[in-house]
Design a protein with these regions (language model features):
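FAD-binding subdomain of flavoenzyme oxidoreductases
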Residues: 155-309, 523
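Conserved phosphate/anionic-ligand binding catalytic regions in large, soluble enzymes, centered on
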Residues: 131-136, 204-205, 250-265, 443-447, ...
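Activity-critical C-terminal alpha-helical subdomain
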Residues: 495-531
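Glycine-rich N-terminal segment of FAD-binding domains in flavoprotein oxidoreductases
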Residues: 49-58, 67-152
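C-terminal substrate-recognition/cap domain of FAD-linked oxidoreductases
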Residues: 12-29, 60-88, 279, 284, ...
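Alpha-helix capping/hinge segments and adjacent helical runs
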Residues: 63, 479-491, 516, 520-524
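A glycine- and small-aliphatic-rich helix-loop capping segment at beta-alpha/alpha-beta transitions
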Residues: 83-85, 135-155, 183-187, 211-218, ...
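Flexible inter-domain linker/hinge segments
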Residues: 1-55, 112, 208
C-alpha cells in the first residue's frame, strides 16, 4: 500500500461533483483547505541496531529477510487510521521500527523472540498493515530498539479437510488470497471486512475482526477453530475439538491478543461451500428506530440473512447525494427522508430464496418497504471503496474517520444519541460543523454494533489533535452509556486507556498476569492492549 493513503496510488480517485457540493455547502470545505503529502519531506528515524545486531538477525532468518532500509521500515511505521494518514502530511518525521525481519517458520519466530528477550529489543507483528487503532506503533516499551516481524512467508494453505469443513492457513494469507486458495477446492471463508483487500488472517484473529457477512457466517473469532501462537516461552497450539469442557478455552485468551502475548503463525478456520446462489433486496424504513426494531426481529426470529445493514437518516442522505451508480437511481425518492436497509442471502438456490422470503416478511411487518435488489447489488459492488474515498476527502480538506461500538438492543438508542452528541459537540467546538452518520451492520439476538462515520472540516494547525479530542469525547460517551470500547477495530493504543473501565481491575490484572507469564521480558508489541 501507499504510505499516505489506503491501497495503491493507482486506486486514488477524484471527488465527484455531488461530494464536492456537499463538502462546500454543509461543511465549508474546499480543495484549498486540504493538506497534501510531500514524499520528499518524509524522514525516517535512524535505526538503533548495530551491524552486529543485523548479523545476529540474519543468522536466524537469512540476510535477505532482514532490512534496515528506510523504504522497508517506513511502510511498517504507521497503520491506516485517519491520524496515521494525516501524520504523513503534517508530521513527516517518522518513528520507524529499527529493522524489518521476515522469519520463514515457527522455529525462526521462536528464535527471534528469544533474541529479542536477550537483547532487550521489542517486536511488533506485521501482517497487512491495516490497523486503525495504533496497533502498529513501534513502541520500544523501554527496550533499546524495536523490530517489525513481518509474516510475509506464512502465506500457504497448509491443509484442507472438506469432511469437517476446516482449513489451516498461514497467518500472512490476505483475505483475497484466502478466497483464491479455498475456491480451488470449492470452498469459501466468507469473511469480508472493510480491510479485506489487504488484511491477513493472523490480523483478523488477533483483532477479533468482524466482516460484512457476519450475520450469515459469524465474526472471525467464531470461525477460528484453532490457532498457533509462538510466545517467548514456547508454542501454544489452541483448539482441538469443535467443543470442549477441558477448562477455559485457550483460544479465547489468544484471539484478540493483538501480538501482546506472541506471534500468531497459522489459523484453523471453519469453511463452507462456495454459495450456489446470491440474492439481494433493499428496504426503506421511515426512521432509524423503526428499522432497528425490524432488524432485531429478524435476528431474534432467526430469519438468517447473510448480510443485513441499516443506515441512519444522515448516512442514507449522504449515500444518495454522493452516489453515481444505481443505488442512487433506484433508491432516490423511495429512501429519501428515511433509512436504507440492505440484505444479501447466500447458499443453495432454495435456501437463499427461503431465507429471503422469511426476512422480507419480517421487515415488511416491521414497517419496511421493499426497494428491490438494485441498491443492495450496488452496495456490494462498491463495498470496499470507502477507504479510497476517505483518501480523496482528506486531500480536499475534510476530516473523515470512523469508530464503532456495540451494546444490547435496549441501550442502543441511548448509546447512539450519546456518541453522536459527543462527536458533534467536540467538532463544533473546534470550529467546524460535523456530519455524524451511523449504521448497524452486525446483529445478535441480544444487541448490535453501531458504526459511526464522521465528516467535518480540518481546522487549525494540527488536525490530528482535532480528531483525537473528538475521539476521546466519543470514547468517554461510549463508556458512560455502557457500550464496548470496540466491537471489531481492536484495542491497540487508542482504546487502551478505556479498557479497564470495561473489564475491571481484576480483569486487567488477569491480562497483565498472562502477559507476564508468556512474555516475561515484555518484548511483544509493548504499549498495545494491556492496561
Amino acid at each position: 500500500m501507499a504510505l499516505s493513503r489506503w491501497g495503491t496510488d493507482a486506486e486514488a480517485r477524484e471527488l465527484g461533483e455531488g461530494i464536492r457540493d456537499l463538502l462546500r455547502d454543509v461543511l465549508g470545505v474546499t480543495a484549498e483547505t486540504g493538506r497534501t503529502f510531500d514524499p520528499a519531506a518524509v524522514s525516517a528515524s535512524p535505526s538503533r541496531l548495530s551491524d552486529a545486531d543485523v548479523r545476529a538477525l540474519a543468522a536466524v532468518v537469512g540476510r535477505g529477510n532482514v532490512s534496515v532500509d528506510d523504504d522497508q521500515r517506513l511502510p511498517r511505521a504507521r497503520g491506516k487510521s485517519t491520524p496515521d494518514l494525516l501524520a504523513w502530511r503534517v508530521r513527516p518525521e517518522v518513528d520507524c521500527p529499527d529493522a524489518v525481519v521476515a522469519p520463514r517458520d515457527d522455529d525462526e519466530v521462536a528464535a527471534l523472540l528469544d533474541w529479542c528477550g536477550r537483547e532487550s529489543v521489542a517486536m511488533v507483528p506485521f501482517g497487512g498493515g491495516t490497523s486503525v487503532v495504533g496497533g502498529l506503533t513501534p513502541d520500544t516499551g523501554g527496550h533499546r530498539a524495536v523490530i517489525s516481524l513481518d509474516l510475509a512467508h506464512f502465506t500457504e494453505l497448509e491443509s484442507i479437510d472438506p469432511v469437517s469443513g476446516e482449513a489451516v492457513l498461514g497467518a500472512g494469507v490476505t483475505g483475497p488470497r484466502a478466497e483464491e486458495l479455498l475456491s480451488g477446492h470449492g470452498f469459501s471463508l466468507g469473511h469480508f471486512p472493510q480491510s479485506f483487500p489487504y488484511a491477513t488472517l493472523g490480523g483478523f484473529a488477533m483483532t477479533r475482526s468482524s466482516g460484512q457477512n457476519s450475520a450469515g457466517y459469524g465474526r472471525f473469532d467464531e470461525m477460528v477453530r484453532g490457532l498457533t501462537v509462538v510466545t517467548p516461552v514456547g508454542v501454544i497450539e489452541a483448539g482441538r475439538a469443535p467443543a470442549s469442557a477441558a477448562g477455559p478455552d485457550l483460544r479465547q485468551w489468544l484471539l484478540g491478543s493483538e501480538g501482546a502475548f506472541g506471534v500468531c503463525t497459522r489459523v484453523r478456520v471453519r469453511i463452507h461451500p462456495v454459495p450456489e446462489a446470491v440474492r439481494y433486496e433493499a428496504f426503506r424504513f421511515p426512521d432509524f428506530a423503526t428499522g432497528a426494531a425490524a432488524l432485531r426481529a429478524v435476528e431474534q426470529q432467526g430469519a438468517g440473512p447473510t448480510v443485513i445493514r441499516l443506515s441512519d437518516e444522515t448516512e442514507t442522505m449522504v449515500n444518495l447525494a454522493t452516489s453515481t451508480d444505481s443505488i442512487g437511481e433506484q433508491a432516490d425518492g423511495a429512501a429519501s427522508g428515511g433509512c436504507l436497509c440492505l440484505c444479501l442471502f447466500e447458499g443453495t438456490a432454495e435456501h437463499a430464496a427461503s431465507r429471503q422470503d422469511e426476512t422480507r416478511a419480517v421487515l415488511l411487518a416491521g414497517g419496511g418497504t421493499s426497494l428491490g435488489p438494485e441498491p443492495a447489488q450496488a452496495w456490494e459492488h462498491g463495498r470496499f471503496g470507502a477507504p479510497v474515498l476517505r483518501d480523496a476527502l482528506l486531500d480536499n480538506g475534510a476530516l473523515v474517520e470512523t469508530l464503532e461500538t456495540a451494546t444490547d438492543w435496549a441501550r442502543l438508542p441511548a448509546l447512539r444519541e450519546a456518541v453522536t452528541g459527543a462527536l458533534t459537540a467536540a467538532l463544533e467546538a473546534s470550529g467546524t460543523p460535523a456530519l455524524v452518520m451511523c449504521h448497524i451492520s452486525h446483529v445478535y439476538p441480544t444487541g448490535a454494533s453501531l458504526y459511526f462515520t464522521v465528516v467535518a472540516g480540518q481546522r487549525g494547525e494540527d488536525p490530528i489533535e482535532q480528531w483525537m479530542v473528538a475521539k476521546r469525547a466519543a470514547s468517554e460517551a461510549i463508556v458512560s452509556a455502557g457500550g464496548t470500547i470496540t466491537h471489531h477495530h481492536a484495542v491497540g493504543t487508542d482504546h487502551r486507556p478505556y479498557l479497564e473501565a470495561e473489564i475491571g481491575d481484576v480483569g486487567s490484572r488477569m491480562l497483565r498476569a498472562v502477559k507476564s507469564a508468556l512474555d516475561p521480558h515484555g518484548v511483544c508489541n509493548p504499549g498495545t492492549l494491556i492496561p
